[in-house]
Amino acid sequence: MPATEAVPFTHPRASWLDPADGRIRDERELLTAMAEKQVVLLGETHSVPEIHRWQLHVATVLRFLRPNIAMGFEMFPRRVQPVLDEWIEGGLSTAAFLEKVEWGTVWGFDAELYLPLFHFCRRHRAPMLALNCHRPLVTRVGKEGWDAVPEDERDGLTPSAPATLAYRRYLAGLRFDRPATGDVDPSLVTDRFIRAQQTWDRAFACNIAKALDVADPPLVIGIIGRGHLEYGHGTPYQLRDLGVSAVGVLLPTASGHHDAASLAGIGDAVFRLDEPEPEIVPPKMAEMIAEARKKAAWV
């Protein structure tokens, strides 16, 4: 008899789906459980406006359930932490904050995508955490490895836990637009690429772990690209290596149907949202994406 094809999961709009079995989760139950974690990571595609609205709404509920929160951002390198602190304390206008934090240099995506999150933190005096590292460190570790970088030049980071074979396959799938759970040749990505990617993963994890190392640790809500979060790889993996195990990963989707095998293990829950307007992609990045698509490569 021919093998029976797996039935795709159906995912209605405005609902949370459990990636393990395709059932629709009760929102109150899910977010109450998330509020008891040490860390909740809200994955994003940086250029999609509706995802940032979703992040804000989830953060609002989590803060209601557990007022002691901090919000960590991939967008900011550690060196601008004093500026984030000044913003939270009301010392800067919005324009002055964006200028002083060097937004156009450190990130480059339209600030309007993120401003509601920044204002949310300021309104509630919820600490904003700079999760990223000094950009040249990523290049240096990728090229030379951690051992070549003296400890005092590592921007406060410890070396990454070694990449698993599954993570190598995952990154190869992303980079070359192939199924994340398929049998992708891990050699398609170089050790240099893996080391660079893991430097970001480790930076986010180290800075989150540092925020938790206090007498009354907050619930840390992470605003991070989903490629650093999916399937337990990336930052969740590095957090576990640092002893932070109570980590939730919530992800958005615009798809109404999911392949069960591809979705399994991607995170704790996936929310189906709408996308009422197009992506907001920086011009230079749009040019890079167009060029990459010509070469049939994912960027």
Where are these regions (language model features)?
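Compositional signal for N-terminal targeting/processing segments
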Residues: 1-299
